[in-house]
């Protein structure tokens, strides 16, 4: 009798372990299938995001350049599509049909009035700002200040250049001055030597008569 309960417990344990293994295998298979499905979805999204060039530019050299639309252009086009949905007036009933044409006439009238009003205002000078004189005066004063600063800067640069040239000229004169002094002393020495020679020759030509 004691062997039967033990064998029964062992059988239950084996069944429980088998059920656990089966559930684990089922979970792993489900996880693998989910991962494969996720991979497939990602690949599908990547394939859809492939951009088509908006236009292709051909150069004379034979090269081509593809121009793609930016994300902002795509967003603007989507907004325009959302704001202005296509409407076929032939498929509308009488009420929406009349409302559609009334809205179209009103928008066209407003756009024409806006255009004409802008042109008339520009002709009559109404579109100019109220304080345009003050604005013009401010810009004129600012321009004069800029011109004055430019003149001052140019005069300072010219004065600086003049000072540099003057210093260079003074240095050149100082470097040349010892040479001129040496040459003048050399000339004076020559003159003195020539004078002494003339005195000696005259004394030789006119000997002094000694009384006997």
UniProtKB/Swiss-Prot annotation:
Signal listed as a keyword: no
InterPro entries attached to this UniProt entry: FAM177
Intrachain S-S bonds: none
Low complexity: bias regions: 13-29
Statement: the UniProt record of this protein carries the keyword Coiled coil: yes
Basic and acidic residues bias spans: 1-11
Pfam families: FAM177
Residues the record lists as Phosphothreonine modifications: 70
Family statement: Belongs to the FAM177 family.
Name the record gives this protein: Protein FAM177A1
Organism: Bos taurus (Bovine)
Lineage, broadest ranks: Eukaryota, Metazoa, Chordata, Craniata, Vertebrata
Gene that produces this protein: FAM177A1
């Amino acid at each position: 009798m004691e062997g039967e309960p033990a064998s029964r417990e062992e059988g239950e344990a084996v069944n429980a372990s088998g059920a656990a293994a089966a559930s684990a295998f089922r979970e792993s298979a489900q996880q693998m299938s989910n991962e494969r499905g996720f991979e497939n979805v990602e690949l599908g999204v990547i394939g859809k995001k492939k951009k088509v060039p908006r236009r292709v530019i051909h150069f004379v050299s034979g090269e081509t350049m593809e121009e793609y639309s930016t994300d902002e252009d795509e967003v603007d086009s989507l907004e325009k599509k959302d704001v202005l949905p296509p409407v076929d007036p032939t498929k509308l009933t009488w009420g929406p049909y009349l409302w559609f044409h009334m809205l179209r006439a009103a928008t066209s009238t407003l756009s024409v009035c806006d255009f004409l009003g802008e042109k008339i205002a520009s002709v009559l000078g109404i579109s100019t700002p109220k304080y345009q004189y003050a604005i013009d005066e401010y810009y004129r004063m600012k321009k004069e200040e800029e011109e004055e600063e430019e003149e001052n800067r140019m005069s300072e640069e010219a004065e600086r250049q003049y000072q540099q040239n003057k210093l260079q000229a003074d240095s050149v004169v100082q470097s040349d001055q010892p040479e001129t002094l040496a040459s003048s002393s050399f000339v004076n020495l020559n003159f003195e030597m020539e004078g002494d020679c003339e005195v000696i020759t005259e004394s030789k030509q006119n000997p002094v008569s000694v009384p006997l």
